[in-house]
């Protein structure tokens, strides 16, 4: 039974009886299995949660039940597999409690990142460490392969392949907590032994691998970088080596919940065990049937480890599937029963039987792709695009389908690793950068730029331009100086020349990241795609800019040449594409949709050597002697087959209503046929009463003759938008006539039409341009800053939060961020009754300080001295304070009517009279009292505090301006709060209706990052 904290009430705006009612409501939504799992709080608990069994509901209910029963939210730690799952849990728990709670729900990596920052003085790290991306890891390894002094590893001039293998090996070492020192000791021990030829070769390879591992670790240390594995290892070491730190986390997190436990690795398990062992209040939730991350070091044996660590555990099973039809559930059961050593459970459902599962045999992979396009088109008559998911084992299986979707102009989201750098729009950006880096040797890139649609240059003119260059022996860049000798468009070519000249001039005075931002905006990449409403290309642009920012974070002093070199290496690797267009069919790897569900699922390429994929032994494996934890008794090949079966099971159980499985008898140019997957045999696909099997015999099924026509129409529509946005109205008319001709429409521009548009009918124009309403999802949660942005300018909000177009980098923010972070750390130390003085403040300043934003040593010294003075004044003021520090970085989520808003309050203090909300500011001047009284952020904070703590005798809110050391506070008036609530309702309705008209203001427009997009 949970013991309540004495006198504790986590939400003072609710009475004890209201919280008890919340607890009762929690159980009203649960079945008996779920209720038992939620109520079990006295012993370690293992929940085996079958697919679609309400796992998230159960976990959220358990957290809410603990809080409603009196456990302070800050004593509960919930760890999830990804950020999306963490956010969903937070939303669900908040809704159940009907009150904002400061919930510690995060991914393992986010949790470890926070632990490191909170204990930065106990580490050798600088607080400004950066997390190195997977791409940056691969680039470093590939680029430096010849500098590692390798003597035995043969990579046959394939540094990229070896880089991928090394990255995988090092990552596995981190997962297994195998250090370079461990490998060194292993080598020293085994060099003394008499070994056969194969073992000697493995040992020699390991010597070279150790050199790479050591060099990689030294590189990160030198550049203040961590990878994800480092974060886990550092926290593990911190908890093991610092008993005081371990004790503090054991007392802080007395209840630990781990979601997707089957996908945790050894080091994650050890961190959880260290924190939870003292109190034993641990709940792990998982399903061994859905363990699909063995390649990341996930241990299916972790369940056995849990039982060994917590022998007094109890086990609950959730087997009621709420997601899928009876036929889908029965088929999934039939498949997974072939897995050995699984926890025995049988999924069941009360859902209707549903349609038969369709298994389709096609002659080849081309006809398979076209069949999928055709059934998708038919499904779109009944379902929304985002209701349909096409789940592939690997990217290669998705490629023919992606191409077929492109040909038929069907919108899709791809989730998984992709040839990002081969996307046309990314090639265009890269072309600009290569020209600026070396214009004389960029002939191919210049041709690519001349073909950019926003320049509107005809192919015949490009041909004349390049022909002249070849005849004269000039580079294409030099040829721009001879335009008067070439019969080309004398208006358009000079524009390109001037563009390149301007950018080359800017190259010498702009940072690389600023130059990239200039190219994306001034060369109308964003403007063109915004006009086309091409969400996919907009997301690609956003992702490229993020890629550039990540490079800038790691190498802040690098020039354009270094970045283009980095690009060259990075383009040899596939990277994860970030695509979240809402109205689009999902095409994804199976791994990419773990935890998701869709009304319709299509699984292509269910062939042997596809699903299951062909087993490939790891080229470089960690010696088994160094592996920790319980090891499986099966060999690697059998473990691979078992995981592939679970992967197919995961794909099947994503489907709610309709499941289609396809396979092809032949792939590509292979003359040998492809066999259907052995897993299809396991579900008895030709005789199973739940399955309708169909053979498609026509080898060129459904290849429509309209593909070329569709592509031409799309190109003409794109050209029309270019004509209109660049003011080429005569060309626009020509494009319209061409479009009409292709669609077999007769278009006669008559004089009466011309007369009609001589005097524009603005009412008519308004009707034409009225925006189609965009419904914000019912579970959408706004941030306070989103409303502040909309209040400032709706169009700016649209670009920033809807289209997610990046803002300009602002280096002057870094000083303020540093001061803010240190003030927060000092306040936290004071709250925890730890010693705080100027020496500690200076230690923190040294840890948090970053030199990267300074180009002048003099400027840096000046700001560093100012920072020391600000912190000195802060401590002096803080020491005078008579208030109690109640909360720091207080997370909240509140409802204003039907609008949900979340945010974090820097600090909440309390004294005898009431509560004080403090927001730290680092601007050079303080705002006036009258300005703050209208500040939306502070008024929303007032609403949040009242909801968290209930009505108080007095509530003050305000800003502490740290640079001028001035505090401005006020008591919010009821009318002001009511006004802001009304304004939030009005703004949310406008956002929901896609009202994003610009708010014209000379100063704001001049300072706006998106001014060049806004006409």
Mark where each language-model region is.
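Conserved motor-region signature of P-loop NTPase helicases/translocases
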Residues: 3-91, 202, 244, 251, ...
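A basic/glycine-biased coupling hinge at the interface between accessory DNA-binding modules
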Residues: 8-24, 42-43, 50-53, 64-233, ...
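Accessory/regulatory regions of helicases
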Residues: 12, 24, 583, 600, ...
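Conserved helicase core region in the C-terminal RecA-like lobe
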Residues: 104-114, 257-260, 285, 394-396, ...
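Accessory C-terminal helicase-associated subdomains
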Residues: 203-210, 215-216, 225, 384, ...
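Metal-dependent nuclease catalytic cores in nucleic-acid-processing enzymes
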Residues: 593, 644-659, 821, 827, ...
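Metal-dependent nuclease catalytic regions and adjoining charged, substrate-binding loops involved
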Residues: 595, 689-714, 839, 945-1015
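Non-catalytic protein-protein interaction segments used by genome-maintenance enzymes to assemble
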Residues: 887-948, 970, 980-984
